[in-house]
Amino acid sequence: MTLAILLSVATACRQNRSTATRNQDGLINIVTTIFPAYDFVRQIAGDRVNLTMLLSPGAESHSFEPSPRDIITIMSSDIFIYTGESEQWIERILLSMNTDEMTIFAMMNVVGLVRKEIVDEPCHECDDQDCAHDHGHEHSHDHGHGHGHGHSHGHGHAHGYGYAYGHAHSHGHEVHTCALFDEHVWTSPGNAILIVRAITELLSEADPNNAAFFQQNAAAYIKELQQLDAAFSEVVANAKRRTIVFADRFPFRHFVDAYSLTHYAAFTGCSTETEPSAGTVAFLINKIRTEQIPVVFHIELSNERMADAISAETGAKKRLLHSVHNVSRRDFEAGLGYLELMRRNVETLREALN
């Protein structure tokens, strides 16, 4: 469905939003675009909110397009949580809505941001030093320059908290950026803690009667996230190596920055490519062989073909490192969440680094 049609739906809804969107049960309506935010709210609020996730379990998040029903769902929300600037359709749709009674929150706005870049040349054409990141060209770091700018949509309540912009260094190679910051901010447990605290604040403001409940749950959940962070730190501190290889897209930029890991990947996190060049495959195979890397990673909901091929060629074990961007229908119905999936990553990373 075209954006123009979706915008017309949003415009039609502009005058139909009531000043109180709570259901008859008195619960506030929370809408999230993707699974991480959905799970964070679920852990904090339990059944004391009406919670909806727009992205269906098992669906590809990067190609998601909202339906008219999704637009109506967003309109009915008291709090709308999305990732950030990568979801460009949201900005345009929200501008067409009456957001006077909505609180709008972007997860990217509470963490230090790093730029991500798409490069045209495969990684095998650069030297080992410059190949330390996605395709060997992505040397971007958060330098902690905070700017307290929040985004406002219509007259809604926007929570920006603060931005911290990174600087991109191309090291002499021609690079072409996708003009976005890496949106996979939740892959760092430290970032997840910041996001959970911000969401808890929003929920407490929206529903003061349940604020103590939200804050108690958040405190317990944050303690578990801190333990998760410590577990990853322990794995890295005692590892034989600090290098991981991805035969897939790479959504773990915030994660590897948090634990000072070196990574080699077929595609950047925002890449729309699905088939790597022969040169990229050859480079990754050579890297695994020369450094005797025992594991080649793929991400969730991947076709795994490239990981299969590289595993067969090198003898490296194929393993899933779950970014928790989305979950399968089976995992969703089983109630698996961020903590469970990331705890699996702890042991998988231990295997890969030893």
Predicted regions and their residues:
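Bacterial N-terminal signal peptides
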Residues: 1-8
